[in-house]
Amino acid sequence: MSQFDHQHLSDTEEKQELKPPSMYKVIINNDDYTPMDFVIEVLMRFFKMDQERATDTMLQVHYKGKAVCGVYSAEIAETKVVQVNQYARENQHPLLCTMEQE
Protein backbone atom coordinates (compact mmCIF):
# COMPACT_ATOMS: atom_id res chain seq x y z
CA MET A 1 0.00 0.00 0.00
CA SER A 2 1.44 3.38 -0.93
CA GLN A 3 1.72 6.29 1.47
CA PHE A 4 -1.04 8.08 -0.47
CA ASP A 5 -3.44 5.14 -0.07
CA HIS A 6 -2.72 4.96 3.66
CA GLN A 7 -3.27 8.73 4.10
CA HIS A 8 -6.53 8.58 2.15
CA LEU A 9 -7.77 5.69 4.31
CA SER A 10 -7.03 7.60 7.54
CA ASP A 11 -8.97 10.64 6.34
CA THR A 12 -11.95 8.47 5.48
CA GLU A 13 -11.88 6.74 8.86
CA GLU A 14 -11.87 10.09 10.68
CA LYS A 15 -14.94 11.28 8.77
CA GLN A 16 -16.93 8.19 9.73
CA GLU A 17 -17.20 8.95 13.44
CA LEU A 18 -20.44 7.54 14.74
CA LYS A 19 -22.84 9.90 16.43
CA PRO A 20 -25.31 8.60 18.98
CA PRO A 21 -28.85 8.29 17.60
CA SER A 22 -31.29 11.13 18.17
CA MET A 23 -33.50 10.56 21.18
CA TYR A 24 -37.19 11.37 21.42
CA LYS A 25 -39.43 12.26 24.35
CA VAL A 26 -42.73 10.40 24.45
CA ILE A 27 -45.39 12.72 25.84
CA ILE A 28 -48.90 12.14 27.19
CA ASN A 29 -51.16 15.16 26.63
CA ASN A 30 -54.07 16.16 28.84
CA ASP A 31 -57.67 16.19 27.72
CA ASP A 32 -60.93 16.79 29.56
CA TYR A 33 -62.41 13.34 29.00
CA THR A 34 -59.92 10.52 29.63
CA PRO A 35 -60.29 9.18 33.19
CA MET A 36 -57.27 9.48 35.45
CA ASP A 37 -57.37 5.75 36.17
CA PHE A 38 -57.03 5.00 32.45
CA VAL A 39 -53.98 7.27 32.16
CA ILE A 40 -52.39 5.45 35.11
CA GLU A 41 -53.15 2.10 33.45
CA VAL A 42 -51.51 3.28 30.20
CA LEU A 43 -48.40 4.49 32.04
CA MET A 44 -48.04 1.19 33.88
CA ARG A 45 -48.77 -0.96 30.82
CA PHE A 46 -46.72 0.79 28.13
CA PHE A 47 -44.04 2.57 30.15
CA LYS A 48 -43.52 -0.04 32.90
CA MET A 49 -44.11 2.50 35.68
CA ASP A 50 -45.08 1.38 39.15
CA GLN A 51 -48.34 2.65 40.67
CA GLU A 52 -46.73 5.57 42.51
CA ARG A 53 -44.72 6.87 39.57
CA ALA A 54 -47.67 6.43 37.21
CA THR A 55 -49.88 8.41 39.59
CA ASP A 56 -47.30 11.20 39.87
CA THR A 57 -46.94 11.34 36.08
CA MET A 58 -50.73 11.35 35.59
CA LEU A 59 -51.01 14.30 38.01
CA GLN A 60 -48.36 16.17 36.04
CA VAL A 61 -50.39 15.55 32.87
CA HIS A 62 -53.53 16.75 34.65
CA TYR A 63 -52.09 19.92 36.18
CA LYS A 64 -49.43 20.93 33.64
CA GLY A 65 -51.15 19.75 30.45
CA LYS A 66 -48.58 17.12 29.51
CA ALA A 67 -45.79 14.94 30.86
CA VAL A 68 -42.80 13.10 29.46
CA CYS A 69 -43.25 9.35 29.92
CA GLY A 70 -39.82 8.34 28.69
CA VAL A 71 -37.00 9.07 26.26
CA TYR A 72 -36.27 6.55 23.51
CA SER A 73 -34.70 6.09 20.11
CA ALA A 74 -36.95 7.13 17.21
CA GLU A 75 -38.22 3.63 16.42
CA ILE A 76 -39.12 2.79 20.01
CA ALA A 77 -40.73 6.21 20.58
CA GLU A 78 -42.84 5.83 17.42
CA THR A 79 -43.94 2.37 18.50
CA LYS A 80 -44.98 3.57 21.95
CA VAL A 81 -46.94 6.51 20.49
CA VAL A 82 -48.82 4.20 18.10
CA GLN A 83 -49.50 1.62 20.83
CA VAL A 84 -50.84 4.18 23.32
CA ASN A 85 -53.00 6.01 20.78
CA GLN A 86 -54.41 2.74 19.41
CA TYR A 87 -55.14 1.43 22.92
CA ALA A 88 -56.86 4.70 23.84
CA ARG A 89 -59.08 4.55 20.72
CA GLU A 90 -59.90 0.89 21.34
CA ASN A 91 -61.11 1.94 24.79
CA GLN A 92 -62.96 4.96 23.38
CA HIS A 93 -60.77 7.62 25.02
CA PRO A 94 -59.33 10.69 23.29
CA LEU A 95 -55.99 10.39 25.11
CA LEU A 96 -53.19 11.62 22.84
CA CYS A 97 -49.59 10.48 22.98
CA THR A 98 -46.98 12.37 20.95
CA MET A 99 -43.22 12.49 20.56
CA GLU A 100 -40.67 15.24 20.07
CA GLN A 101 -36.95 15.24 19.54
CA GLU A 102 -34.93 15.83 22.67
From Swiss-Prot:
Transmembrane domains' residue ranges: none
Disulfide bonds: none
Record GO biological process: protein catabolic process; proteolysis
Domain of life of the native organism: Bacteria
Biased composition (Basic and acidic residues): 1-18
Pfam families: ClpS (PF02617)
InterPro entries reported in the protein's UniProt record: ClpS, ClpS_core, Ribosomal_bL12_C/ClpS-like
Region of interest called Disordered, as start-end residue ranges on this chain: 1-21
Family classification: Belongs to the ClpS family.
Function per UniProt: Involved in the modulation of the specificity of the ClpAP-mediated ATP-dependent protein degradation.
Record text on subunit structure and interactions: Binds to the N-terminal domain of the chaperone ClpA.
Protein's name in the database: ATP-dependent Clp protease adapter protein ClpS
Native source organism of the sequence: Idiomarina loihiensis (strain ATCC BAA-735 / DSM 15497 / L2-TR)
The encoding gene: clpS
